[in-house]
From Swiss-Prot:
Coiled-coil regions listed in the entry: none
Descriptive protein name: Glutelin type-A 2
Keyword Disulfide bond: yes
Paired cysteines (S-S): C46-C79, C122-C313
Entry's transmembrane regions: none
Domain of life: Eukaryota
Family of the protein in this entry: Belongs to the 11S seed storage protein (globulins) family.
Signal peptide: 1-24
Lineage: Eukaryota, Viridiplantae, Streptophyta, Embryophyta, Tracheophyta
Amino acid sequence: MASINRPIVFFTVCLFLLCDGSLAQQLLGQSTSQWQSSRRGSPRGCRFDRLQAFEPIRSVRSQAGTTEFFDVSNELFQCTGVSVVRRVIEPRGLLLPHYTNGASLVYIIQGRGITGPTFPGCPETYQQQFQQSGQAQLTESQSQSHKFKDEHQKIHRFRQGDVIALPAGVAHWCYNDGEVPVVAIYVTDINNGANQLDPRQRDFLLAGNKRNPQAYRREVEEWSQNIFSGFSTELLSEAFGISNQVARQLQCQNDQRGEIVRVERGLSLLQPYASLQEQEQGQMQSREHYQEGGYQQSQYGSGCPNGLDETFCTMRVRQNIDNPNRADTYNPRAGRVTNLNSQNFPILNLVQMSAVKVNLYQNALLSPFWNINAHSIVYITQGRAQVQVVNNNGKTVFNGELRRGQLLIVPQHYVVVKKAQREGCAYIAFKTNPNSMVSHIAGKSSIFRALPTDVLANAYRISREEAQRLKHNRGDEFGAFTPLQYKSYQDVYNVAESS
């Protein structure tokens, strides 16, 4: 009997482990390889033979903010499969709950506030009971009838430099409780495998209405209404157990405040007292560095999530990319580079995107490189940079200056070089792969360092000495390069040879 059951037990255990691993990969959206992607390919006919710097071409005003739209009808946006929006939320402004058909990364350029992504099926872990004033003397039975309870899912406080990850179809809202406007750039990947609709961004409003940005050339103003507008008030009343009057309020038929509304008296939200105290004392940054930079790195640094480390409901949705202590590479004379990918920010497995923040000092140069497995959407946050991009035919497809507020799309495999101007430069690059990789041409861990000297000498018809210089002039630098002249390179090389 035991000999008969042993193979069955072994088969059952193997089947369970296989299914459990598959479930974990589905939950975390993890690709089987860094080289693979779940994105759809670009439409046929995409040539990428002329790149350009983009700025918002139109804006839509709401009661308490502005939504600025980039020209997503441009071929470059359509070929890379991304949509970009910049939002300005004024103090006490509330971005109404909505969800999108594509996964998004949000970078907070300025300001601070609160956001609340709502994940389906997750519990409302923030709970509190209130009692109306003047009820303390009532009996227990009477008191219960005068109590009401508020509960909601976890809310997240954000600040300047945070990257917020929003999976496709996850509703979220945002509130500015600071004293300056919140400025945020939203990059949505509509070619993501999670989007099974047509390849264009669709925002589904749960509240309010907004002006249609596509109608800016028309004489008649058009509005996009929220999802409840299409249902009858009778069905809404029955579904929610509310009156017809309240059901009509859900439809917001006469609400022209837009998607960002003003909360005159501010929001009353459940928040842990310690978080508020940390914010008031200005200690949030150091606390986050200890908790997220130390503990979280040791927990997830292996890059092998098993489905138990971080569940769907408790995933961190934000990470600060501006913190200098998080820099992956740093040159005190040139700048720093910080990467966010699924290894240190696991929710990016669901979003299938990643981000890189680059800070270049005065006249510093970023090593020429190409993106191996992703398109790159570069947004300048500070300063100016001279940028050149070259395609597979050796043709310069972009040669110009990028300044603050401008955006450049760099296609996969195209070679790019960036040089900061006198005031320096800072930018964030959104990548269409959760584990984006680049191949540097110069410096440490570069292509030239990996090639034999004789290969370089014969490939470029130069002497072996020149080939050695080509390999080692930037041999001690990685990523951000110090602005040196050729003579300085030669002096450094001669000193190294003599020693």
